[in-house]
Amino acid sequence: DAIVDFLPSPKVIPAISGVAPRSVDEVVVAHNEDDPFCGIAFKVVSDPYTGRLVYFRVYSGKVTGGTSLLNVTKGRKERMGRIVRMVANKREEVEELKAGDIGASVGLKDTFTGDTLTLENRPLLLETIKFPEPVISVAIEPKSKAEQEKLTDGLIKLAEEDPTFQTKYDEETAQTIVSGM
């Protein structure tokens, strides 16, 4: 019941609006399968077997694997890889997703949480997710220099998955500083 209450299908909520980046005009997005594709990425997971898995919701239109898209938030072209529908921790490969569907894709290299994806010929920027600034920071270091690369790789993956997590290297103290919620 909570999912239905807090995450209703786009088909049962009022149309949403976005901004056309070139003209800054407001555009209304109807939740219709016949309109051009528009979706938003809401989660990124690093999978040890398939790599990055980007979860997204389709607000209008439909999308198939191999479709050329525009990441409007970043201004970069992307190619939709295989599309899967997640059922618990199992993946069900599907041909296409339509307005109202939630799915995931492998192969979106430059897409992160909150990014808007559209067809290249109809760019539209939906309201992005606003994340709070980190509230705590701590210095970390590996047990040995040999583990530095593993630590760095792990921190990069964690930062991709969690937009509230940040990492930086402090030149003065020669320490890695991680910040988060």
Residue ranges and their predicted role:
Residues D1-M181:
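Structural and coupling elements of P-loop NTPases
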